[in-house]
Swiss-Prot record:
Component of the thioredoxin-thioredoxin reductase system. Participates in various redox reactions through the reversible oxidation of its active center dithiol to a disulfide and catalyzes dithiol-disulfide exchange reactions. This is Thioredoxin. Belongs to the thioredoxin family. Residues 2-108 form the Thioredoxin domain. InterPro entries: Thioredoxin, Thioredoxin-like_sf, Thioredoxin_CS, Thioredoxin_domain. Disulfide bonds join C33-C36.
Length: 108
Protein backbone atom coordinates (compact mmCIF):
# COMPACT_ATOMS: atom_id res chain seq x y z
CA UNK A 1 0.00 0.00 0.00
CA UNK A 2 1.14 3.48 -0.79
CA UNK A 3 1.84 5.79 2.12
CA UNK A 4 0.39 8.53 -0.06
CA UNK A 5 -3.14 7.09 0.25
CA UNK A 6 -5.24 8.37 3.11
CA UNK A 7 -7.87 6.09 4.64
CA UNK A 8 -10.95 8.06 5.68
CA UNK A 9 -14.05 7.17 7.66
CA UNK A 10 -17.42 8.67 8.51
CA UNK A 11 -15.73 10.36 11.48
CA UNK A 12 -12.75 11.77 9.56
CA UNK A 13 -14.45 12.64 6.25
CA UNK A 14 -15.12 16.29 7.04
CA UNK A 15 -11.60 16.96 8.33
CA UNK A 16 -9.67 14.85 5.81
CA UNK A 17 -11.73 15.57 2.68
CA UNK A 18 -13.99 18.59 3.03
CA UNK A 19 -11.44 20.74 4.89
CA UNK A 20 -8.40 19.62 2.89
CA UNK A 21 -6.20 22.36 1.45
CA UNK A 22 -5.59 20.16 -1.63
CA UNK A 23 -8.16 18.57 -3.92
CA UNK A 24 -9.08 15.05 -2.75
CA UNK A 25 -10.00 12.08 -4.93
CA UNK A 26 -12.08 9.71 -2.78
CA UNK A 27 -12.43 6.07 -3.80
CA UNK A 28 -15.61 4.55 -2.35
CA UNK A 29 -14.92 0.81 -2.25
CA UNK A 30 -15.47 -2.50 -0.42
CA UNK A 31 -13.36 -5.63 0.18
CA UNK A 32 -15.75 -7.83 -1.82
CA UNK A 33 -15.71 -5.58 -4.91
CA UNK A 34 -13.67 -7.06 -7.77
CA UNK A 35 -13.44 -3.86 -9.85
CA UNK A 36 -12.36 -1.99 -6.69
CA UNK A 37 -9.44 -4.37 -6.33
CA UNK A 38 -8.56 -3.86 -10.00
CA UNK A 39 -8.17 -0.10 -9.64
CA UNK A 40 -6.37 -0.17 -6.26
CA UNK A 41 -2.85 -0.37 -7.78
CA UNK A 42 -3.73 2.41 -10.23
CA UNK A 43 -4.85 4.63 -7.36
CA UNK A 44 -1.58 3.94 -5.55
CA UNK A 45 0.36 5.09 -8.62
CA UNK A 46 -1.84 8.18 -8.96
CA UNK A 47 -1.36 9.00 -5.26
CA UNK A 48 2.41 9.01 -5.76
CA UNK A 49 2.48 10.74 -9.16
CA UNK A 50 -0.02 13.48 -8.25
CA UNK A 51 1.14 13.94 -4.63
CA UNK A 52 2.00 17.62 -5.20
CA UNK A 53 -1.47 18.43 -6.57
CA UNK A 54 -3.90 15.94 -5.07
CA UNK A 55 -4.67 13.69 -2.10
CA UNK A 56 -6.05 10.23 -2.79
CA UNK A 57 -8.35 8.79 -0.14
CA UNK A 58 -10.05 5.43 0.23
CA UNK A 59 -13.42 5.08 1.93
CA UNK A 60 -14.67 1.60 2.86
CA UNK A 61 -18.46 1.71 2.48
CA UNK A 62 -19.06 -1.43 4.55
CA UNK A 63 -17.25 -0.04 7.59
CA UNK A 64 -18.67 3.49 7.20
CA UNK A 65 -22.37 3.51 6.25
CA UNK A 66 -23.24 7.15 6.95
CA UNK A 67 -21.32 9.16 4.35
CA UNK A 68 -22.10 7.27 1.07
CA UNK A 69 -25.85 8.11 1.03
CA UNK A 70 -24.98 11.81 1.33
CA UNK A 71 -23.31 11.54 -2.09
CA UNK A 72 -25.80 9.10 -3.66
CA UNK A 73 -23.23 6.30 -3.88
CA UNK A 74 -25.14 3.46 -5.55
CA UNK A 75 -22.36 1.40 -7.13
CA UNK A 76 -18.69 0.91 -6.50
CA UNK A 77 -16.04 1.78 -7.23
CA UNK A 78 -17.15 5.40 -7.27
CA UNK A 79 -14.53 8.13 -7.43
CA UNK A 80 -15.48 11.59 -6.19
CA UNK A 81 -13.23 14.61 -6.65
CA UNK A 82 -13.57 17.31 -4.00
CA UNK A 83 -12.05 20.78 -4.25
CA UNK A 84 -12.31 23.32 -1.44
CA UNK A 85 -14.90 21.17 0.30
CA UNK A 86 -17.18 20.87 -2.71
CA UNK A 87 -17.90 17.85 -4.90
CA UNK A 88 -16.53 18.80 -8.33
CA UNK A 89 -16.68 15.59 -10.37
CA UNK A 90 -17.72 11.93 -10.23
CA UNK A 91 -16.59 8.78 -12.02
CA UNK A 92 -18.28 5.41 -11.50
CA UNK A 93 -16.70 2.08 -12.35
CA UNK A 94 -13.20 0.78 -12.85
CA UNK A 95 -11.07 3.10 -14.97
CA UNK A 96 -7.79 2.46 -16.70
CA UNK A 97 -4.85 4.58 -15.61
CA UNK A 98 -5.07 6.53 -18.88
CA UNK A 99 -8.77 7.25 -18.28
CA UNK A 100 -8.15 8.30 -14.70
CA UNK A 101 -5.22 10.58 -15.53
CA UNK A 102 -7.23 12.19 -18.35
CA UNK A 103 -10.11 12.76 -15.92
CA UNK A 104 -7.82 14.26 -13.27
CA UNK A 105 -5.86 16.40 -15.74
CA UNK A 106 -9.14 17.89 -17.00
CA UNK A 107 -10.20 18.75 -13.43
CA UNK A 108 -7.00 19.94 -11.74
Amino acid sequence: MSDAILYVSDDSFETDVLKSSKPVLVDFWAEWCGPCKMIAPILEEIADEYADRLRVAKFNIDENPNTPPQYAIRGIPTLLLFKAGKLEATKVGALSKAQLTAFLDSQL
